[in-house]
Amino acid sequence: MINKHIFATLFFALFATITGVGIVVPLLPVYANSMGAGGLYIGLIFGAFSISRSILLPFFGRLSDQKGRKPFIIVGMLCYSVVSVAFALSTNVMHLIIIRFLQGIASAMIMPVVQAYVGDITPPGREGTTMGLFNMALFLGLSLGPVAGGIINDSFSLQSTFICMGLLSLLGFLLCLALLPPTRDESVVLQGRKPIAWKTIIADRSIAGLFVFRFTYTSGIGVIWGFLPVLADVELHLSSARIGVLVMLGVFVSGIVQLPMGRLADRMNRKVMVVVGGLIAAAAMIAYQRAFSFEYLFGISCLFGIGGGIAMPALMAIAVTKGQQAEAMGSVISLLTMGHSLGMMVGSMGAGVMMDWFDLRIAFFLGAVLMFIGVAFFMFCLRKDPNPKSFPE
Protein backbone atom coordinates (compact mmCIF):
# COMPACT_ATOMS: atom_id res chain seq x y z
CA MET A 1 0.00 0.00 0.00
CA ILE A 2 1.35 3.40 -0.99
CA ASN A 3 2.11 5.94 1.76
CA LYS A 4 -0.66 8.46 1.04
CA HIS A 5 0.79 11.12 3.35
CA ILE A 6 4.12 11.24 1.50
CA PHE A 7 2.44 10.95 -1.90
CA ALA A 8 0.03 13.83 -1.21
CA THR A 9 2.82 16.05 0.13
CA LEU A 10 5.01 15.48 -2.91
CA PHE A 11 2.03 15.87 -5.27
CA PHE A 12 0.86 19.25 -3.97
CA ALA A 13 4.37 20.62 -3.40
CA LEU A 14 5.42 19.75 -6.94
CA PHE A 15 2.13 21.08 -8.32
CA ALA A 16 2.68 24.46 -6.64
CA THR A 17 6.32 24.69 -7.76
CA ILE A 18 5.66 23.64 -11.35
CA THR A 19 2.67 25.98 -11.65
CA GLY A 20 4.97 28.83 -10.68
CA VAL A 21 7.50 27.80 -13.31
CA GLY A 22 4.73 27.44 -15.88
CA ILE A 23 3.62 31.01 -15.25
CA VAL A 24 7.00 32.37 -16.33
CA VAL A 25 8.68 30.03 -18.83
CA PRO A 26 6.27 30.36 -21.80
CA LEU A 27 6.62 34.14 -21.65
CA LEU A 28 10.44 34.07 -21.70
CA PRO A 29 10.71 33.83 -25.53
CA VAL A 30 8.53 36.92 -25.97
CA TYR A 31 10.40 38.67 -23.14
CA ALA A 32 13.75 37.85 -24.75
CA ASN A 33 12.46 38.87 -28.18
CA SER A 34 11.54 42.28 -26.75
CA MET A 35 15.20 42.60 -25.66
CA GLY A 36 16.32 41.99 -29.25
CA ALA A 37 17.13 38.28 -29.01
CA GLY A 38 17.11 36.23 -32.21
CA GLY A 39 16.23 32.58 -32.58
CA LEU A 40 19.63 31.30 -31.41
CA TYR A 41 19.58 33.37 -28.22
CA ILE A 42 16.03 32.25 -27.45
CA GLY A 43 17.28 28.70 -27.89
CA LEU A 44 20.19 29.41 -25.54
CA ILE A 45 17.82 30.64 -22.84
CA PHE A 46 16.16 27.24 -22.82
CA GLY A 47 19.37 25.36 -23.57
CA ALA A 48 21.27 26.86 -20.62
CA PHE A 49 18.73 25.34 -18.25
CA SER A 50 19.15 21.93 -19.85
CA ILE A 51 22.96 22.07 -19.85
CA SER A 52 23.33 22.69 -16.12
CA ARG A 53 20.57 20.27 -15.21
CA SER A 54 21.97 17.52 -17.43
CA ILE A 55 25.46 17.80 -15.93
CA LEU A 56 24.25 17.44 -12.35
CA LEU A 57 21.32 15.04 -12.72
CA PRO A 58 23.34 11.81 -12.34
CA PHE A 59 25.18 13.25 -9.34
CA PHE A 60 22.07 14.30 -7.41
CA GLY A 61 20.10 11.21 -8.45
CA ARG A 62 22.74 8.76 -7.24
CA LEU A 63 23.51 10.78 -4.12
CA SER A 64 19.83 10.76 -3.17
CA ASP A 65 19.92 6.94 -3.36
CA GLN A 66 22.59 6.99 -0.67
CA LYS A 67 21.79 10.07 1.45
CA GLY A 68 18.01 10.39 1.21
CA ARG A 69 15.50 12.36 -0.87
CA LYS A 70 14.26 15.17 1.38
CA PRO A 71 17.41 17.36 1.61
CA PHE A 72 17.69 17.70 -2.17
CA ILE A 73 13.99 18.42 -2.63
CA ILE A 74 13.77 21.24 -0.09
CA VAL A 75 17.03 22.92 -1.17
CA GLY A 76 15.99 22.79 -4.82
CA MET A 77 12.59 24.32 -4.15
CA LEU A 78 14.09 27.09 -2.04
CA CYS A 79 16.53 27.88 -4.86
CA TYR A 80 13.60 28.15 -7.28
CA SER A 81 12.08 30.91 -5.17
CA VAL A 82 15.41 32.78 -5.16
CA VAL A 83 15.70 32.42 -8.95
CA SER A 84 12.35 34.17 -9.38
CA VAL A 85 13.80 37.28 -7.75
CA ALA A 86 16.74 37.17 -10.16
CA PHE A 87 14.34 37.02 -13.13
CA ALA A 88 12.62 40.16 -11.90
CA LEU A 89 15.95 42.00 -11.70
CA SER A 90 17.28 40.93 -15.14
CA THR A 91 17.93 43.66 -17.72
CA ASN A 92 19.30 41.84 -20.79
CA VAL A 93 19.36 38.52 -22.60
CA MET A 94 22.65 37.41 -21.03
CA HIS A 95 21.09 37.76 -17.58
CA LEU A 96 18.27 35.46 -18.65
CA ILE A 97 20.73 32.85 -19.92
CA ILE A 98 22.72 32.89 -16.66
CA ILE A 99 19.59 32.72 -14.51
CA ARG A 100 18.24 29.79 -16.49
CA PHE A 101 21.61 28.03 -16.02
CA LEU A 102 21.27 28.42 -12.24
CA GLN A 103 17.65 27.34 -12.38
CA GLY A 104 18.77 24.14 -14.08
CA ILE A 105 20.97 23.31 -11.09
CA ALA A 106 17.98 23.66 -8.76
CA SER A 107 15.84 21.56 -11.07
CA ALA A 108 18.41 18.74 -10.96
CA MET A 109 17.76 18.52 -7.22
CA ILE A 110 13.97 18.40 -7.58
CA MET A 111 12.50 16.47 -10.50
CA PRO A 112 14.40 13.15 -10.51
CA VAL A 113 14.55 13.01 -6.72
CA VAL A 114 10.82 13.67 -6.28
CA GLN A 115 9.95 11.05 -8.89
CA ALA A 116 12.41 8.61 -7.32
CA TYR A 117 10.74 9.20 -3.95
CA VAL A 118 7.38 8.31 -5.50
CA GLY A 119 8.98 5.25 -7.09
CA ASP A 120 10.28 4.19 -3.67
CA ILE A 121 6.75 4.06 -2.24
CA THR A 122 5.06 2.52 -5.31
CA PRO A 123 3.64 -1.01 -4.79
CA PRO A 124 4.67 -3.64 -7.39
CA GLY A 125 2.18 -3.92 -10.24
CA ARG A 126 0.90 -0.37 -9.68
CA GLU A 127 3.73 1.51 -11.38
CA GLY A 128 1.59 2.86 -14.22
CA THR A 129 -1.28 4.00 -12.01
CA THR A 130 0.97 5.62 -9.41
CA MET A 131 3.22 7.45 -11.87
CA GLY A 132 0.24 8.42 -14.02
CA LEU A 133 -1.50 9.97 -11.03
CA PHE A 134 1.65 11.71 -9.83
CA ASN A 135 2.48 13.03 -13.29
CA MET A 136 -0.81 14.92 -13.16
CA ALA A 137 0.87 17.31 -10.71
CA LEU A 138 3.58 18.00 -13.27
CA PHE A 139 1.38 18.29 -16.35
CA LEU A 140 -1.50 20.17 -14.74
CA GLY A 141 0.92 22.58 -13.08
CA LEU A 142 2.62 23.26 -16.39
CA SER A 143 -0.75 23.69 -18.11
CA LEU A 144 -2.37 26.03 -15.60
CA GLY A 145 0.81 28.08 -15.27
CA PRO A 146 0.89 29.42 -18.85
CA VAL A 147 -2.77 30.47 -18.70
CA ALA A 148 -2.24 32.24 -15.39
CA GLY A 149 0.97 33.79 -16.71
CA GLY A 150 -0.75 35.17 -19.79
CA ILE A 151 -3.57 36.65 -17.73
CA ILE A 152 -1.20 38.14 -15.15
CA ASN A 153 1.01 39.60 -17.89
CA ASP A 154 -1.96 41.14 -19.73
CA SER A 155 -3.57 42.47 -16.54
CA PHE A 156 -0.50 43.59 -14.62
CA SER A 157 3.09 43.14 -15.83
CA LEU A 158 5.73 40.54 -16.58
CA GLN A 159 7.40 41.37 -13.27
CA SER A 160 4.25 40.21 -11.49
CA THR A 161 4.64 36.75 -13.01
CA PHE A 162 8.08 36.42 -11.44
CA ILE A 163 6.63 37.30 -8.03
CA CYS A 164 3.96 34.62 -8.43
CA MET A 165 6.60 32.05 -9.36
CA GLY A 166 8.60 32.89 -6.25
CA LEU A 167 5.62 32.62 -3.91
CA LEU A 168 4.48 29.28 -5.32
CA SER A 169 8.00 27.82 -5.16
CA LEU A 170 8.24 28.98 -1.56
CA LEU A 171 4.95 27.21 -0.82
CA GLY A 172 6.34 23.96 -2.24
CA PHE A 173 9.45 24.36 -0.09
CA LEU A 174 7.42 24.89 3.09
CA LEU A 175 5.15 21.89 2.39
CA CYS A 176 8.11 19.52 1.97
CA LEU A 177 10.03 20.98 4.90
CA ALA A 178 7.11 20.60 7.28
CA LEU A 179 5.35 17.44 6.09
CA LEU A 180 7.92 15.02 4.66
CA PRO A 181 9.36 12.60 7.23
CA PRO A 182 12.98 13.02 8.35
CA THR A 183 15.65 11.52 6.12
CA ARG A 184 16.38 8.78 8.65
CA ASP A 185 12.81 7.47 8.18
CA GLU A 186 12.98 7.22 4.39
CA SER A 187 12.99 3.80 2.76
CA VAL A 188 16.21 4.55 0.88
CA VAL A 189 17.61 1.28 -0.42
CA LEU A 190 21.33 2.00 -0.19
CA GLN A 191 22.66 2.47 3.33
CA GLY A 192 26.44 2.19 3.18
CA ARG A 193 26.40 -0.27 0.25
CA LYS A 194 28.05 0.33 -3.10
CA PRO A 195 25.52 1.42 -5.76
CA ILE A 196 25.09 -0.44 -9.03
CA ALA A 197 27.63 0.64 -11.67
CA TRP A 198 26.53 3.21 -14.24
CA LYS A 199 27.78 0.97 -17.05
CA THR A 200 25.37 -1.75 -15.91
CA ILE A 201 22.43 0.66 -16.01
CA ILE A 202 23.41 2.13 -19.37
CA ALA A 203 24.02 -1.32 -20.90
CA ASP A 204 20.42 -2.34 -20.26
CA ARG A 205 18.61 -2.21 -23.62
CA SER A 206 15.32 -1.18 -22.10
CA ILE A 207 16.91 1.77 -20.29
CA ALA A 208 18.64 2.82 -23.53
CA GLY A 209 15.32 2.74 -25.37
CA LEU A 210 13.58 4.70 -22.63
CA PHE A 211 16.37 7.30 -22.60
CA VAL A 212 16.33 7.92 -26.35
CA PHE A 213 12.54 8.09 -26.53
CA ARG A 214 12.44 10.56 -23.63
CA PHE A 215 15.18 12.59 -25.34
CA THR A 216 13.42 12.84 -28.70
CA TYR A 217 9.94 13.38 -27.24
CA THR A 218 11.23 16.24 -25.11
CA SER A 219 13.05 17.74 -28.09
CA GLY A 220 9.58 18.24 -29.56
CA ILE A 221 8.45 19.93 -26.36
CA GLY A 222 11.53 22.17 -26.55
CA VAL A 223 10.53 23.26 -30.04
CA ILE A 224 6.95 23.95 -28.97
CA TRP A 225 7.79 25.82 -25.77
CA GLY A 226 10.51 27.84 -27.44
CA PHE A 227 8.94 28.70 -30.77
CA LEU A 228 5.17 28.26 -30.68
CA PRO A 229 4.91 31.53 -28.68
CA VAL A 230 7.04 33.29 -31.30
CA LEU A 231 4.98 31.86 -34.18
CA ALA A 232 1.74 32.85 -32.47
CA ASP A 233 3.01 36.33 -31.61
CA VAL A 234 4.96 37.34 -34.73
CA GLU A 235 2.99 35.63 -37.52
CA LEU A 236 -0.51 35.22 -36.07
CA HIS A 237 -0.47 38.27 -33.74
CA LEU A 238 -2.21 36.50 -30.86
CA SER A 239 -2.54 37.95 -27.36
CA SER A 240 -0.44 36.75 -24.43
CA ALA A 241 -3.48 35.04 -22.93
CA ARG A 242 -4.14 33.08 -26.14
CA ILE A 243 -0.47 32.15 -26.41
CA GLY A 244 -0.65 30.87 -22.85
CA VAL A 245 -3.70 28.78 -23.73
CA LEU A 246 -1.90 27.21 -26.70
CA VAL A 247 1.16 26.29 -24.66
CA MET A 248 -1.10 25.03 -21.88
CA LEU A 249 -3.23 22.75 -24.03
CA GLY A 250 -0.67 20.09 -24.80
CA VAL A 251 0.37 19.53 -21.21
CA PHE A 252 -3.18 19.99 -19.88
CA VAL A 253 -4.62 17.31 -22.16
CA SER A 254 -1.66 15.07 -21.38
CA GLY A 255 -2.24 15.62 -17.67
CA ILE A 256 -5.92 14.70 -17.90
CA VAL A 257 -5.23 11.35 -19.55
CA GLN A 258 -2.26 10.43 -17.32
CA LEU A 259 -4.31 8.51 -14.75
CA PRO A 260 -6.47 6.42 -17.13
CA MET A 261 -3.46 5.72 -19.33
CA GLY A 262 -1.44 4.81 -16.22
CA ARG A 263 -4.06 2.29 -15.20
CA LEU A 264 -4.05 0.92 -18.73
CA ALA A 265 -0.25 0.60 -18.56
CA ASP A 266 -0.66 -1.80 -15.61
CA ARG A 267 -2.90 -4.03 -17.71
CA MET A 268 -1.51 -4.09 -21.24
CA ASN A 269 1.70 -4.05 -23.29
CA ARG A 270 3.58 -0.91 -22.26
CA LYS A 271 5.74 -0.93 -25.38
CA VAL A 272 2.67 -0.57 -27.61
CA MET A 273 1.45 2.39 -25.58
CA VAL A 274 4.80 4.19 -25.87
CA VAL A 275 4.98 3.61 -29.64
CA VAL A 276 1.39 4.69 -30.33
CA GLY A 277 1.74 7.80 -28.18
CA GLY A 278 5.05 8.72 -29.81
CA LEU A 279 3.64 8.41 -33.33
CA ILE A 280 0.64 10.60 -32.47
CA ALA A 281 2.91 13.28 -30.99
CA ALA A 282 5.24 13.17 -34.02
CA ALA A 283 2.28 13.58 -36.39
CA ALA A 284 1.18 16.63 -34.41
CA MET A 285 4.65 18.16 -34.78
CA ILE A 286 4.37 17.90 -38.56
CA ALA A 287 0.95 19.54 -38.46
CA TYR A 288 2.33 22.58 -36.58
CA GLN A 289 4.11 23.63 -39.79
CA ARG A 290 0.79 24.48 -41.44
CA ALA A 291 -0.55 26.65 -38.63
CA PHE A 292 -2.82 29.44 -39.86
CA SER A 293 -5.19 30.24 -36.98
CA PHE A 294 -5.73 29.99 -33.26
CA GLU A 295 -8.35 27.28 -33.76
CA TYR A 296 -5.98 25.14 -35.83
CA LEU A 297 -3.21 25.42 -33.24
CA PHE A 298 -5.76 24.59 -30.54
CA GLY A 299 -6.58 21.25 -32.15
CA ILE A 300 -2.96 20.33 -32.90
CA SER A 301 -1.85 21.14 -29.35
CA CYS A 302 -4.58 18.82 -28.03
CA LEU A 303 -3.37 16.06 -30.36
CA PHE A 304 0.21 16.44 -29.14
CA GLY A 305 -1.01 16.22 -25.55
CA ILE A 306 -2.93 13.02 -26.24
CA GLY A 307 0.19 11.42 -27.68
CA GLY A 308 2.28 12.32 -24.66
CA GLY A 309 -0.47 11.26 -22.29
CA ILE A 310 -0.54 7.78 -23.81
CA ALA A 311 3.23 7.30 -23.90
CA MET A 312 4.57 8.79 -20.67
CA PRO A 313 2.77 6.71 -17.98
CA ALA A 314 3.88 3.50 -19.69
CA LEU A 315 7.41 4.85 -20.10
CA MET A 316 7.68 5.81 -16.43
CA ALA A 317 6.14 2.51 -15.30
CA ILE A 318 8.94 0.63 -17.07
CA ALA A 319 11.50 2.99 -15.51
CA VAL A 320 10.15 2.53 -11.97
CA THR A 321 10.23 -1.25 -12.38
CA LYS A 322 13.86 -1.03 -13.49
CA GLY A 323 14.75 1.27 -10.60
CA GLN A 324 13.22 -1.08 -8.03
CA GLN A 325 15.03 -4.10 -9.46
CA ALA A 326 18.39 -2.32 -9.52
CA GLU A 327 17.89 -0.76 -6.07
CA ALA A 328 18.89 2.48 -7.78
CA MET A 329 15.67 4.42 -8.28
CA GLY A 330 17.36 7.81 -8.18
CA SER A 331 20.02 6.77 -10.68
CA VAL A 332 17.54 5.32 -13.19
CA ILE A 333 15.08 8.22 -12.94
CA SER A 334 17.89 10.78 -13.16
CA LEU A 335 19.13 9.13 -16.35
CA LEU A 336 15.70 9.50 -17.94
CA THR A 337 15.45 13.07 -16.68
CA MET A 338 18.83 13.71 -18.30
CA GLY A 339 17.29 12.57 -21.57
CA HIS A 340 14.52 15.08 -20.91
CA SER A 341 17.03 17.89 -20.32
CA LEU A 342 19.19 17.08 -23.32
CA GLY A 343 16.09 16.82 -25.49
CA MET A 344 14.89 20.23 -24.37
CA MET A 345 18.33 21.66 -25.13
CA VAL A 346 18.75 20.04 -28.54
CA GLY A 347 15.17 20.77 -29.54
CA SER A 348 15.21 24.43 -28.58
CA MET A 349 18.71 25.21 -29.85
CA GLY A 350 18.37 23.15 -33.04
CA ALA A 351 15.05 24.81 -33.79
CA GLY A 352 16.63 28.21 -33.15
CA VAL A 353 19.30 27.50 -35.75
CA MET A 354 16.66 26.29 -38.22
CA MET A 355 14.66 29.47 -37.60
CA ASP A 356 17.66 31.73 -38.24
CA TRP A 357 18.95 29.81 -41.28
CA PHE A 358 15.70 28.81 -42.95
CA ASP A 359 12.24 29.58 -41.61
CA LEU A 360 10.45 29.51 -38.26
CA ARG A 361 8.07 26.75 -39.37
CA ILE A 362 10.95 24.43 -40.34
CA ALA A 363 11.74 24.21 -36.62
CA PHE A 364 8.65 22.05 -36.10
CA PHE A 365 9.72 19.69 -38.89
CA LEU A 366 13.00 19.13 -37.03
CA GLY A 367 11.06 18.15 -33.93
CA ALA A 368 8.97 15.65 -35.91
CA VAL A 369 12.04 14.00 -37.44
CA LEU A 370 13.67 13.55 -34.03
CA MET A 371 10.51 12.05 -32.59
CA PHE A 372 10.14 9.50 -35.39
CA ILE A 373 13.77 8.50 -34.79
CA GLY A 374 13.05 8.08 -31.09
CA VAL A 375 10.07 5.79 -31.71
CA ALA A 376 12.10 3.64 -34.11
CA PHE A 377 15.00 3.32 -31.66
CA PHE A 378 12.64 2.45 -28.81
CA MET A 379 11.09 -0.33 -30.90
CA PHE A 380 14.55 -1.64 -31.79
CA CYS A 381 15.74 -1.74 -28.17
CA LEU A 382 12.60 -3.35 -26.76
CA ARG A 383 11.60 -5.57 -29.70
CA LYS A 384 12.49 -8.76 -27.78
CA ASP A 385 11.37 -7.41 -24.42
CA PRO A 386 7.92 -5.79 -24.84
CA ASN A 387 7.15 -5.62 -21.13
CA PRO A 388 10.58 -5.72 -19.46
CA LYS A 389 10.73 -7.04 -15.92
CA SER A 390 14.38 -7.98 -15.41
CA PHE A 391 17.61 -6.11 -14.96
CA PRO A 392 21.01 -7.36 -16.17
CA GLU A 393 23.29 -8.65 -13.47
Regions flagged by a language model, labelled:
Residues 99-138:
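Cytoplasmic helix-loop-helix junction between adjacent transmembrane helices
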Residues 109-122, 310-324:
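Intracellular juxtamembrane helix-capping segments at the cytosolic ends
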Residues 36, 68, 89-95, 237, ...:
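Helix-breaking motifs and short loop linkers at transmembrane-helix boundaries and internal kinks
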Residues 71-85, 166, 272-286:
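Structural signature of the two symmetry-related core transmembrane helices
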Residues 27-39, 226-241:
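Short amphipathic helix-loop junctions that connect adjacent transmembrane helices
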Residues 83, 94-102, 295-303:
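Paired small-residue
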Residues 167-186, 377-382:
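C-terminal membrane-cytosol helix-exit motif in multi-pass small-molecule transporters
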Residues 1-3, 181-211, 393:
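Juxtamembrane intracellular "pre-TM" segments in multi-pass secondary transporters
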